[in-house]
Amino acid sequence: MKFNKLFASLVAVSLSIINIHVSAKTILLVPQDNRPVSLAYTVSTAEKAGYTVLTPPEQYLSTNHHQGLPELIWSWIDNNIEKADAAVISTDTLIYGGLVDSRKHTDSIDKLMYREKRIQQLHEKFPQKPIYAFGTIMRTPYASNTGVEPYYYTKYGPTIYHIAVLQDKLDKVGLTPNEEKQLTQLKASIPTEYLQDWFNRREKNNAITQNLIKYTKDNIFTYFCLGLDDSTVYSQSAMEARYLKNDFKNLSENKLGAFPGADQLALLLIARYHVDDNQLSPTFNIIYPLGRGEDTIPSYESQPVGKTIAQHITAVGGTININTPDIVLAANTPLFTTKESGQFANFKMSKPSTKEFVASIK
């Protein structure tokens, strides 16, 4: 996703510009899968900032083609945690196996809670080691034929998506008579067992997330970040996030953040550890090109990009200061709307609007 790269750039810049001498600190990192954005890019950025990064063997991690191995990853943690000064962990990996596994698993709630309990036990055994954790609210995609959703999503994904949109709208503002009729027809058009499977998995995942929020309240996590993976204004993901906010409404934003994104979260938490450990208070100013700027709502997200950037700055331990910032973040938002990554408008080329924006930065 284009804007996930933007936020990854934000935290990478945070590490590089506010970097002071790092005295060979070691971070134990459990990524959400083995993709470069989750593993290689994150490790490389942290190492360039002076950190040693420990990661599980790649064959233990989730991919698009096979499940992650949480039991083996937990054994690896047990054998390596004493070498680390801090831990940055994907709860999706430790509980479900990985990001994709969180959408497809068939594990019982008892098994999931057993794995989740091990996080608490890790903190109890090593209370002096800060744990920075990140998880996701399961996404609600319009369609998927890449094997990263349950098998029935290839055929029924758009139907499930529209059911979720209408149910969220019903819960939030209500439906018109025509929309109520449409919702009934959509539910009747899909085998009941598929809907039950999808919603039952979400119910289990939601219960796990509620416990993770409790762990944050109990100071098991130094900081917990909850990402909304590929969401829209109306969706099952947006509705779950709305209700989960009641569970953490009394928590400081310096303890828990919830906002769109998934791929950038590990790097964000490494930057947060860097800020905490060095007792820094970085300040930012954000500038935008012509167009909707901060009011742009990216595809697959449920809120304006300006709000999301501000939440990322808070999550990394920074504040906005337009007068004397440590960092000026230039967010290259589109003139109108965001495009799909494969569309011609997103090909790498020198565009007049981009040239003008870069010139204004200089």
For each predicted feature, which ranges?
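Sec-dependent N-terminal signal peptides of Gram-positive bacterial secreted proteins and lipoproteins
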Residues: L15-S16
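Bacterial N-terminal signal peptides that target proteins for export
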Residues: M1-L10
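A ubiquitous, low-specificity "background" feature that marks scattered single residues
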Residues: L10-V11, N332
